[in-house]
Amino acid sequence: MAKHGKRYLEAAKKVDSTKFYSVDEAMKLAKETSYANFDATIEVAYNLNVDPKQADQQIRGALVLPNGTGKSKKVVVFAEGPQADQAKEAGADEVGSDDLVEKVQNGYLDFDVVIATPMMMAKVGRLGRILGPKGLMPNPKTGTVTMDVAKAVENQKAGQVEYRVDKQGLIHAPIGKASFDAEKLAQNFDALRDVILRARPASTKGQYVKSVAVSATFGPGIHLDPLNLD
């Protein structure tokens, strides 16, 4: 078991590990237990009763948080013609086609999000070994393969987050920064909660959400009642 430092242990004393906190309480406590010397990310972790091996239980999607994430993203777009112009006007950091493919092949990775038009995916596919392991391959489920590249860029710049269940049935997603008001964190939490609850597979039996916890970067987990997430 990993040893925790003094600052973590001091933060953990503020959390009662035997109780469930309300959303409002959890957001306030996540801020209070943030001890990093930077503006820590507040993250939520869902443990779901799903089997990701089943195609209909591979929960994945994206949403624009009402109050953003507090992080500015560098967005690159693979597009040509009118879509390339629209992406530039929407604020994309880099837009290109074969030239951008070559640039990435030569080591350019200074970006957080990749968006592509459907026609460009054959070219982007050549970058699979580079982008795939970093989770940067565009995907229609997250709105990053689209003809409406301008809207996709705007969503990313506005604070879109992606959520995806992993092999253990867990979803981790950021809902803001420790500098956010607790109320804004709660609004972001609610928005993510709603899409995850709506994504419940029809084939899932019994309790869908097994556990939910929020925490600041390096901070202790703060548990909420999985049966009462209001």
UniProtKB/Swiss-Prot annotation:
One of its GO terms (cellular component) is large ribosomal subunit. It holds the Pfam family Ribosomal_L1. One of its GO terms (biological process) is translation. The keyword Nucleotide-binding does not apply. It comes from the Bacteria. Gene3D superfamilies: 3.30.190.20, 3.40.50.790. Keywords: Repressor, Ribonucleoprotein, Ribosomal protein, RNA-binding, rRNA-binding, Translation regulation, tRNA-binding. InterPro entries: Ribosom_uL1_bac-type, Ribosomal_uL1, Ribosomal_uL1-like, Ribosomal_uL1/biogenesis, Ribosomal_uL1_3-a/b-sand, Ribosomal_uL1_CS. GO terms for molecular function: rRNA binding; structural constituent of ribosome; tRNA binding. Part of the 50S ribosomal subunit. Binds directly to 23S rRNA. The L1 stalk is quite mobile in the ribosome, and is involved in E site tRNA release. Protein L1 is also a translational repressor protein, it controls the translation of the L11 operon by binding to its mRNA. Belongs to the universal ribosomal protein uL1 family. This is Large ribosomal subunit protein uL1.
